[in-house]
Amino acid sequence: MAERTHACGKVTVEAVGQTVQLKGWVQKRRDLGGLIFIDLRDRTGIVQVVFNPETSKEALEVAETIRSEYVLHVEGTVVERGEGAINDNMATGRIEVQATKVNVLNAAKTTPIIIADDTDASEDVRLKYRYLDLRRPVMFNTFKMRHDVTKTIRNFLDTEEFLEVETPILTKSTPEGARDYLVPSRVHDGEFYALPQSPQLFKQLLMVGGFERYYQVARCFRDEDLRADRQPEFTQIDIEASFLTQEEILDMMERMMTKVMKDAKGVEISAPFPRMTYADAMARYGSDKPDTRFEMELTDLSEFAAGCGFKVFTSAVESGGQVKAINAKGAASKYSRKDIDALTEFVKVYGAKGLAWLKVEEDGLKGPIAKFFGEEDANVLMNTLEATAGDLLLFVADKKSVVADSLGALRLRLGKELELIDESKFNFLWVTDWPLLEYDEDADRYFAAHHPFTMPFREDVELLETAPEKARAQAYDLVLNGYELGGGSLRIYERDVQEKMFKALGFSQEEAQEQFGFLLEAFEYGTPPHGGIALGLDRLVMLLAGRTNLRDTIAFPKTASASCLLTEAPSPVAEAQLEELNLKLSLKEEK
């Protein structure tokens, strides 16, 4: 078999007159009665091959048997297309290859999906036949971008003198948040490894070990409820450094992301990135990962509501809640009563009891609650919300968390429905000054807002023992277009501070020692100040490639039920395998 001389998508007018050896898949076959045209595809693109009896009767006879997705080796001569046959939409659209020889390297059955960007296959079918789905150019281009992003990050961190170090996949189960994936040990009866939710503890131990600058393209595993932008196994760019301040870390990440955007996406972005405190983000956008590509911020009306004539508003404020609103500019005519009812049902998903609304008309406010506001209150309301005729005003009165969640989600929905979002924009944002702990009423205890190893502000360390809910974290999240790209922080590096943190989280001294004794001891041997960040590679690629589903950025992803339709994992195992592990199944009966 002759060696390939050209990739299909790289045959241009410079090759006219040359004999070329091409290898690839049949994208399309057209029989024009005496002439057969084949679009031959490889990962670089498509080239048109012509089978003409005047050039080679033998090649034409073989071409008559060829079908879509056959794998071919074609030898032929590159010629220019006639004036009327030029296709400027193709990189190879000014030439074609006159075939002199063709060899079928492999035949193909009729494929269950159309191998084209606009395939008609459902996602389940695409995942079952993932190896065919990956042939589509849009999929290859996504993974080419993933490669480019990873390469750029590696090159950047190399110039910054970071070492790439691998950390264990089989590790210890620790209570870090999501459920662990457990792996039974054959050697140690009744004991289990856990797959890492992140390399958090090991990267901190590398700082104890004096490596100073570490990174890893790390596989992480979390047994949690899935959604469109989550997978049970995912990849993060894990970065940690000693002796750097928060400002130095943020500056370095901005330089890295600027280079990624330029090299992998061809987009120039400016740094430094805007910054917003967690409290400000929640107050203005109802989200800790605000999409700043459009306006429509939340407005706090609690002070106004306390003295207005609408009991729903006043009672919410009196019970310690708040009233907030968003002004959908010019949207009054675009939303019927039925449409607003749909918005009401939407906010109920986030815990809201309802959605109050008003339309602004030339002669004043109209809507079911307009009667509760006199002229003076109506003017205050309109001035506060900067409302003019044609605007739609939407209100939620409830607990602060419910108001934020419901209006934050409603804002995003309206942004999409009203086409307010400029999809060409890439708005990076740092969200800083997070709360260190969050209180869970159901569990009646505090949980770490990020993780238990986040350093509080120095002046807040004592609050861990007196008022944990007031302690602030030296933490920062990088947000892009309303998605959390990654989170980081300065880390606790002193044993006494870490013990106070564990105590605030409800760990007894014995539990802390049992779970994290190795880390606490490490902190007694001269641990340097350190911090870092972990960026979600899958999510970053999803946003840069313009995909809407994280599964499109992972070669062989899982479904929403954490199963692989291609290999049918997870699957039962043989009884002998269980016996070898000294395990016995006790399955719950389905009701």
UniProtKB/Swiss-Prot annotation:
InterPro entries: Aa-tRNA-synt_II, aa-tRNA-synth_II, aa-tRNA-synth_II/BPL/LPL, Asp-tRNA-ligase_1, Asp-tRNA-ligase_1_N, Asp/Asn-tRNA-synth_IIb, AspRS_core, GAD-like_sf. Its EC number is 6.1.1.23. It is found in: Cytoplasm. The keyword ATP-binding applies. GO terms for biological process: aspartyl-tRNA aminoacylation. Its main location: cytoplasm. Gene3D superfamilies: Bira Bifunctional Protein, Domain 2 (3.30.930.10), GAD-like domain (3.30.1360.30), Nucleic acid-binding proteins (2.40.50.140). L-aspartate binds at E176, R222, H450, R491. It comes from the Bacteria. The record marks G84 as: Important for tRNA non-discrimination. It catalyses: tRNA(Asx) + L-aspartate + ATP = L-aspartyl-tRNA(Asx) + AMP + diphosphate. ATP binds at R222, D223, E224, Q231, E484, G536, L537, D538, R539. The keyword Lipoprotein does not apply. Residues 200-203 are annotated as: Aspartate. Belongs to the class-II aminoacyl-tRNA synthetase family. Type 1 subfamily. Aspartyl-tRNA synthetase with relaxed tRNA specificity since it is able to aspartylate not only its cognate tRNA(Asp) but also tRNA(Asn). Reaction proceeds in two steps: L-aspartate is first activated by ATP to form Asp-AMP and then transferred to the acceptor end of tRNA(Asp/Asn). This is Aspartate--tRNA(Asp/Asn) ligase. It comes from Bacillus cereus (strain AH187). The lineage of its organism: Bacteria, Bacillati, Bacillota, Bacilli, Bacillales.
